[in-house]
């Protein structure tokens, strides 16, 4: 069965720029005039699938469009509005947050009291890493490309220190001094 989702929030991600180019990429390019691939949070407004009732909120690859026709075989996640607002499912509770968590806890295996250094500290994944690091009693040093982003990373994203890699005369020395 199929169902129709009305998108409420759409993701805008750096990868989408690459998908707009013709040629070799890790994913098929989006055709000119086609619907841009994107994760979205939406509400089911019509359903011909008993497992997916109308009114339920979902997170999935619905694309940049107001409405998406979705097959029941699509990879979807139910959005629990008791946990967080719909928009959070595109950020810290979605793919960016999952990427941050896996990178920090499962790949880096960072332990409380350790220091981690994060590139693109003010980006979607880097911002989530900073917050998770702080919650896990890690000291996070963030690399950013300008002083405004550095200030946001310190004030809002959990970073103990930040380094503007564009203005640092010796990045290695700046990192060593911060660590």
Walk through the language-model features, giving the residues of each:
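Gly/Ala-rich phosphate-binding loop of Rossmann-like dinucleotide-binding domains
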Residues: 100, 130, 134
């Amino acid at each position: 069965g199929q169902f129709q989702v009305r998108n409420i929030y759409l993701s805008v991600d750096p990868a989408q720029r690459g998908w707009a180019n013709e040629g070799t990429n890790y994913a098929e390019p989006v055709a000119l005039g086609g619907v841009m691939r994107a994760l979205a949070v939406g509400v089911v407004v019509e359903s011909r699938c008993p497992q997916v009732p109308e009114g339920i909120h979902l997170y999935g690859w619905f694309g940049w469009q107001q409405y998406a026709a979705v097959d029941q075989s699509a990879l979807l996640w139910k959005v629990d509005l008791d946990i967080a607002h719909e928009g959070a499912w595109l950020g810290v509770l979605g793919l960016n947050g999952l990427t941050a968590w896996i990178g920090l806890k499962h790949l880096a295996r960072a332990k409380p009291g350790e220091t981690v250094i994060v590139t693109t500290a003010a980006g979607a994944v880097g911002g989530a890493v900073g917050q998770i690091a702080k919650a896990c009693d890690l000291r996070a040093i963030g690399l950013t490309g300008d002083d405004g982003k550095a200030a946001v990373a310190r004030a809002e994203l959990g970073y103990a220190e930040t380094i503007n890699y564009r203005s640092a005369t010796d990045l290695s020395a700046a990192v060593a001094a911060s660590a």
